[in-house]
Amino acid sequence: MSFPAGIMWRVRRTVVLLHGFTHTGRSWDPVVARLGERYRALAPDIRGHGAAAEARPVSPAECAADVAAAAPESFVLAGYSMGGRLALHVALSHPGRVEALVLVAATPGLADPVEREARAREDAALAEQIEASTIEEFAERWGRNPLFKGQPTEVADAAHADRLRNTTAGLAAALRGLGQGACEPLWGRLGELRMPVVLVVGELPVPRVALAERMAAAIPHADVLVVPATGHAVHLEAPGIVAEAIVQAASAREPAC
């Protein structure tokens, strides 16, 4: 195929967006709206959530395989919180396919086995509470989590509406299979990441900033973006900034035309 002189053909990039616990792919809509026409967004529902609420088993390996099967041969990858942890699994399992990685309020897990075991017990108890609740009851309780304190009303309302797209059985299964207590930590493998990585974190949960900086020190090509006046759910509170971070990360690895 030939083009007139002076006309450049641009490849439309694919961005895969992985949501957090209790959310669905719809939670990324504000970011997708700001990515622009050069990007094709895929925001799947992770096992245990939304349209995939009944998919079993729920494990990092199975969920990573789902992402790899749905995505094109090469893609930009972003994930929030639990979805960020899953994004790490995908990037480490398919390093040649992930062009750039953006992690929003995400960590590689709990390195301390004692802390991880304690978290597993907490998650097991919470999973039982979720199963004993209606989705409306649990969504209301989860929205009061201190992690989300100070969210603008419109952001909190949108997050609540998204949680109602889930089922309690699905969320309980997701917590048991994808919670920090259930997953092996990936701290020791961060050095394997060779693609450009951007770690996005809100400035308000100060421990998260320190964790992001610690992660960046272990990743060969990583930058930390601290977003002022935002909390844990940065992509909901500042979707324009997160979209720009994705664009910048993607630009660092432009495909050949």
Give a label for each model feature:
Residues 45-50, 107, 230-231:
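Short beta-to-alpha linker loops that shape the active-site pocket of alpha/beta-hydrolase fold enzymes
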Residues 13-20:
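Short beta-strand element of the alpha/beta-hydrolase
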Residues 20-23, 81:
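Active-site glycine-rich loops that stabilize anionic/oxyanionic intermediates
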Residues 3, 29-78, 244-247:
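Active-site loop/oxyanion-hole signature of alpha/beta-hydrolase fold enzymes
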Residues 230-239:
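Catalytic histidine-centered segment of alpha/beta-hydrolase-like enzymes
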